[in-house]
């Protein structure tokens, strides 16, 4: 698939800011994407058609598009229904990422059926599975997702508090040894250059970094917390 070759090996920067964050602005996210490109990023992950359309005016990098939408207290919120798929396809994104965990979807549709429905309607659209476990990765691989991302590892009830770097990246090592046909993308809690480097050394070709690059409030907070640990 052409898109896989186009974004082969490198850093993808997630440029997102939610409504309650100071940098919530499609214009600001587009400039963040431009800065990421200048810094050497080979792709962008973005949330919402407004941000995506603005980012496309600034950079010509491949875009992983998502729409975060909460439905009736459902845990699944990353591109959860066909409505969000339609919006992203109409906007035009290289890859659509969606929650591919085993959790209940807001419309009651099973992941297998959801994937099949997407492929029937948009057969050429590249899809990325955001997973939180080995079993979910294997299932996504069998379904035929183009990419599998560790995005939700540490962010579900069963994995809460876990970190991709735990036990010398044991979860990542397990995925790499599972003979997945889909291209593996490491995403989630890669908050230092050394962690990203480690992923590539282990054999990963694509790593997504978000908050460590694009959320200055969080970055500032980490500095302040370390400073405040020093007793006067």
Curated annotation (Swiss-Prot):
* EC id: 5.1.3.9
Q: Which UniProt keywords apply?
A: Carbohydrate metabolism, Isomerase
What does the record give as its pathway? Answer: Amino-sugar metabolism; N-acetylneuraminate degradation; D-fructose 6-phosphate from N-acetylneuraminate: step 3/5
GO BP, sorted A to Z: carbohydrate metabolic process; N-acetylmannosamine catabolic process; N-acetylneuraminate catabolic process
Catalyzed reactions = an N-acyl-D-glucosamine 6-phosphate = an N-acyl-D-mannosamine 6-phosphate
Magnesium: present as a keyword of the record?
A: no
What the entry lists under Pfam families is as follows: NanE
Q: Which GO terms describe its cellular component?
A: cytosol
The answer to keyword Isomerase applying to this record is yes
GO molecular function list: N-acylglucosamine-6-phosphate 2-epimerase activity
Instruction: State what this protein does.
Output: Converts N-acetylmannosamine-6-phosphate (ManNAc-6-P) to N-acetylglucosamine-6-phosphate (GlcNAc-6-P).
Similarity comment: family membership: Belongs to the NanE family.
Q: What protein is this chain from? A: Putative N-acetylmannosamine-6-phosphate 2-epimerase
- The record lists the organism as Borreliella burgdorferi (strain ATCC 35210 / DSM 4680 / CIP 102532 / B31) (Borrelia burgdorferi)
């Amino acid at each position: 698939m052409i898109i896989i070759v186009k974004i082969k090996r490198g850093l993808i920067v997630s440029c997102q800011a939610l409504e309650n964050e100071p940098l919530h602005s499609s214009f600001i996210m587009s400039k963040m994407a431009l800065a990421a490109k200048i810094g050497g990023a080979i792709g962008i992950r973005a949330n919402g058609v407004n941000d995506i359309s603005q980012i496309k005016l600034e950079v010509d990098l491949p875009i992983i598009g998502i729409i975060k939408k909460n439905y009736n207290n459902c845990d699944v919120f990353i591109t959860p229904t066909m409505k969000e798929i339609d919006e992203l396809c109409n906007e035009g994104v290289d890859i659509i990422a969606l929650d591919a965990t085993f959790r209940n979807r807001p419309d009651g549709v099973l992941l297998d059926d959801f994937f099949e429905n997407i492929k029937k309607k948009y057969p050429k659209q590249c899809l990325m599975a955001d997973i939180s476990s080995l079993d979910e990765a294997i299932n996504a691989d069998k379904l035929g997702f183009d990419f599998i991302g560790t995005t939700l590892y540490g962010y579900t009830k069963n994995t809460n508090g876990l970190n991709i770097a735990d036990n010398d990246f044991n979860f990542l090592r397990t995925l790499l040894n599972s003979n997945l046909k889909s291209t593996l993308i490491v995403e989630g809690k890669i908050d230092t250059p050394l962690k990203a480097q480690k992923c590539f050394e282990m054999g990963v070709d694509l790593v997504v970094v978000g908050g460590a690059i694009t959320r200055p409030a969080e970055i500032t907070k980490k500095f302040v917390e370390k400073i405040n640990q020093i007793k006067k």
